UniProtKB/Swiss-Prot annotation:
Cofactor(s) the protein needs: Zn(2+)
Keyword flag Cytoplasm: yes
EC number, as in UniProt: 6.1.1.7
Domain characteristics, as noted in the entry: Consists of three domains; the N-terminal catalytic domain, the editing domain and the C-terminal C-Ala domain. The editing domain removes incorrectly charged amino acids, while the C-Ala domain, along with tRNA(Ala), serves as a bridge to cooperatively bring together the editing and aminoacylation centers thus stimulating deacylation of misacylated tRNAs.
Keywords from the named record: Aminoacyl-tRNA synthetase, ATP-binding, Cytoplasm, Ligase, Metal-binding, Nucleotide-binding, Protein biosynthesis, RNA-binding, tRNA-binding, Zinc
The name this protein goes by in its record: Alanine--tRNA ligase
Origin species: Helicobacter pylori (strain HPAG1)
Annotated residues for binding of Zn(2+): 554, 558, 656, 660
GO cellular component term, pick one: cytosol
Length: 847
């Protein structure tokens, strides 16, 4: 059964709108990762955004619980049901139906669609929710309904806000496998397994803790797909289900170990963590020293340590990650698109950690011998493992788990604090915590005049070094920040890079402006000093000519978003952007790849608006008025009460503080150069306009001219087709008579290399020519060696022969007893492969 599709279809038939899984990185500063199905509906539940036109929703949401408040990382591999990454099936009501329908829908799906027996189902409810008890009694005897307290059956989003009692459906997995003292309904054992949680959001909790009834109660439910899959397959552990089978097979092949061996927990850790690594990398999270990137790093390193336990001393996880990408490619197409990138990044991170893993393990094992009687691991050693060998603290604790020990946290924290004191503050720290308070007290916000002009006289209010310490004089070859009394330089923002240019003093260039940024409301420009400048100097500030090219790309970005919404639908919204002088990059919400027809329509629409020579129009107005006029706003962005609105007549209207062209005709032309996936539900378009558009057209024209010359045909398509036909015919050429043929004990032996032609067809021709044959033909193509072999009335199997030879080439072979093929990337081993092929054949013939 396709549980995901069954669930979504069931609720769609009940009038629910189906929502795609939102990215694992939410647009919510309070969350590290998307950890529940309700996250994408949080603003609806809290009233920040109005209820949708269809007040019922359903989704299958990818969730991540590693790091932050919800962290299952340390339990993964040691329990039957914990995962870092999992799918949560859910249905939601926004002030529409409530308890009765939610319970009815859940019971129907669980008993009819999933086929669970009613006699095996148990229900928990909040101790004060008599209404839910009465509703459940229609389906379940009262002795299988248990009342529980706030700890188990009351849900709230935070200390204040929407909240309410919840009801959970449990299934009895049978006493046959569970005989522990806690294996009773309501106990801590695994016999009674929770499969579905129904949250009845009917209250609002005030800041002082008082509960008030909501005028329109809502429903939020969640059910783990992995858990249901295991139950349907009568498995007592999620990792034993068919969802994880391809991963277990790959790990078994890599380790030459059986999944049912003593290393079963390590199998499970690697399988789980490979899924998390694959999805996080594919959705744009990268290995880092902090935040989400560090959580990703911790997950990978924990997996590598478990691989190490199973004897894997080289990079391996990237191969398991590749299997994940293939396994989920039908439901999450971006995994297939990004598979190569994901595997490469995973491999490189593995290589980095493996450089220190062996040494770190030696230190760890040595330190184990000196554990005190309380089994407390030295905090200083744990810190050294962290600081020198890259062992995250939870990895060290995980290694200590099997020894019944734990880290001396006080000692570890003390070492960490000492390092922080020694360390020089990072740029981010300087920016966030530096003497900006002193700067803000000393200087009022400088005046930005860049909308009206690209050049103006200005007074240098102050110069600052890289630590933002004020300096009196800036000398040649220094890089310093300057604060001008008024400035034409636009500060980086809204996706557009900061202005560059120059400062002139006494008609001479005194400094090159490398960049412009806004810190706490002040526009600073980064300078490379050419001629000494000091506080109070009068200068001429001049923006570089690239400003116009940036403006062209910025205006083109607005036209692009408008075109995307027209072609793809109003669901398109900006998810990120970059505007430079030579290109633009625009990320937007859309669930699938754009086809050629859609891309052509978008490009044509943008160019149509350019050719209309539409004037830009800038207005300042209250935020509500701007939204009423249909101005597009960036989701999640905080706006002031009064906003700047940029429009190009009917073509585009957006809230924007950036620099734009006065007329779309100045953009010149627009070309999409690339469309790709960024993460789940987010696509990216890269494009050029203005001078970059002309340069691209010029280069393409030159390439076309060269192609015509090489093909000796002014019709390039016809020339290419003719060339393809020629290549095809050459590949069909008969086997070269130059291939060496030896006759040994009545069997014709052919082992050789060809430069062109279809080697499989060559084998067929050889088999038709000779009554008894052993043949293996090699060919180098696309930085690989491919081989084909045929056996006819000879004492060896083709598939065995091919596979043995392929291993020298770093590959694998497959086929039948009479025919097989293989390939590998180790081109330098070709001669060794030839020798092995011949020696293996001779041995078989002599045997």
């Amino acid at each position: 059964m396709d549980i995901r599709n069954e669930f979504l279809q069931f609720f769609q038939n009940k009038g629910h709108a189906v929502y795609p899984s939102m990215p694992l990185v939410p647009n919510d500063a309070t969350l590290l990762f998307t950890n529940a199905g309700m996250v994408q509906f949080k603003d609806i539940f809290t009233g920040i955004v109005p209820h949708p036109s269809i007040p019922r929703a359903t989704s299958s949401q990818l969730c991540m619980r590693a790091g932050g408040k919800h962290n299952d990382l340390e339990n993964v591999g040691y329990t039957a049901r914990h995962h870092t990454l999992f799918e949560m099936l859910g249905n939601f009501s926004f002030g529409d139906y409530f308890k009765e329908e939610a319970i009815l829908f859940a019971w129907e799906f669980v008993t009819k669609n999933l086929g669970f027996k009613p006699k095996d189902l148990y229900i928990s409810v909040h101790e004060k929710d008599d209404e839910a008890v009465k509703l459940w009694e229609k389906f379940v005897p009262v002795d299988r309904i248990k009342k529980m307290g706030d700890k188990d059956n009351f849900w709230q989003m935070g200390d204040s806000g929407p909240c309410g009692p919840c009801s959970e459906i449990y299934i009895d997995q049978g006493e046959k496998h569970f005989k522990g003292s806690e294996d009773y309904f309501g106990g801590e054992g695994d016999r009674f397994l929770e499969i579905w949680n129904l949250v009845f959001m009917q209250y609002e909790r005030s800041n002082d803790g008082v509960l008030s009834p909501l005028p329109k109660p809502s429903i939020d439910t969640g059910m783990g797909l992995e858990r249901v899959q295991a139950l349907l397959e009568h498995k007592l552990n999620n990792f034993d289900s068919s969802l994880f089978a391809p991963l277990m097979e790959e790990i078994s092949e890599l380790t030459s170990l059986d999944y049912t061996s003593e290393f079963q927990p390590s199998f499970r850790v690697v399988a789980d963590h490979a899924r998390a690594v694959a999805f996080l990398l594919a959705q744009g999270v990268h290995f880092n020293k902090e935040g989400r990137g560090y959580v990703l790093r911790r997950i990978l390193r924990r997996a590598l340590r478990h691989g190490y336990l199973m004897g894997l001393k080289e990079a391996f996880l990237y191969k398991v990650v590749g299997v994940v990408c293939e396994q989920f490619s039908n439901t999450h197409a971006y995994l297939k698109e990004s598979k190569e990138m994901v595997m490469k990044e995973c491999f490189e991170e593995e290589e980095r950690f493996l450089e220190t893993l062996e040494s770190g393990m030696e230190l760890f094992n040595l330190s184990l011998k000196h554990l005190n009687e309380n089994k407390i691991f030295d905090g200083k050693i744990a810190f050294k493992l962290y600081d020198t060998f890259g062992f995250p603290l939870d990895l060290t604790n995980d290694m200590l788990r099997s020894h019944g020990a734990c880290v001396d946290m006080q000692g570890f924290e003390l070492c960490m604090q000492e390092q922080v004191k020694r360390s020089k503050a990072s740029w981010k720290g300087k920016q966030d915590n530096a003497d900006f308070s002193a700067i803000l007290n000393a200087y009022a916000p400088n005046e930005f005049v860049g909308y009206e002009t690209t050049e103006c006289p200005a007074k240098a209010l102050g110069f600052f070094d890289s630590d933002f310490k004020e300096i009196i004089e800036a000398n040649p070859n220094q890089e310093v920040w300057v604060l001008l009394e008024k400035t034409p330089f636009y500060a980086e923002g809204g996706g557009a890079i900061g202005d560059r240019g120059a400062l002139f003093k006494d008609n001479e260039e005194a400094a090159i402006v490398l960049d412009t940024k806004n810190f706490f409301g002040l526009n600073f420009s980064l300078l490379e000093i050419k001629k000494a400048l000091k506080k109070g100097d009068q200068v001429i500030a001049q923006v570089s000519d690239e400003r116009l090219e940036i403006a062209k790309h910025h205006s083109a970005t607005h036209l692009l978003q408008s075109a995307l919404r027209e072609v793809l639908g109003s669901h398109v919204s900006q998810a990120g952007s970059l505007v430079e002088s030579k290109r633009l990059r625009f990320d937007f919400s859309h669930p699938k790849v754009l086809n050629d027809e859609e891309l052509e329509k978008v490009e044509d629409l943008v160019n149509a608006q350019i050719f209309k020579h539409l004037n830009s129009h800038v207005e300042h107005m209250p935020l509500n008025q701007a939204k009423d006029k249909g101005a597009l706003a960036l989701f999640g962005e905080k706006y002031a009460e009064n906003v700047r609105v940029v429009s190009f007549k009917e073509a585009s209207i957006e809230l924007c503080g950036g620099i734009h062209v006065e007329n779309t005709g100045l953009i010149g032309g627009f070309r999409i150069v690339k469309e790709s996936g960024v993460s789940s539900g987010v696509r990216r378009i890269e494009a050029v306009c203005g001078k970059a558009f002309y340069q691209l057209a010029k280069e393409e024209s030159k390439e076309l001219k060269n192609a015509k010359t090489l093909l000796k045909n002014n019709d390039v398509i016809a020339g290419i087709n003719k060339l393809k036909e020629s290549v095809k015919n050459s590949q069909k050429a008969p086997v070269s008579v130059d291939l060496p043929v030896e006759k040994i004990h009545g069997v014709n032996l052919v082992v050789g290399v060809v430069e062109q032609g279809d080697i499989k067809e060559m084998i067929d021709r050889l088999k038709s020519k000779h009554e008894r044959l052993l043949a293996m033909v090699f060919k180098k193509e696309n930085e690989r060696i491919t081989l084909a072999c045929g056996v006819k009335n000879a004492p060896i199997k083709a598939n065995v022969w091919a596979n043995e030879v392929a291993q020298i080439l770093g590959g694998k072979g497959g086929g039948r007893d009479d025919f097989a093929s293989a390939g590998g990337k180790d081109i330098e081993n070709l001669q060794a492969a030839l020798n092995l092929a011949k020696n293996t054949a001779l041995k078989a013939l002599e045997g």
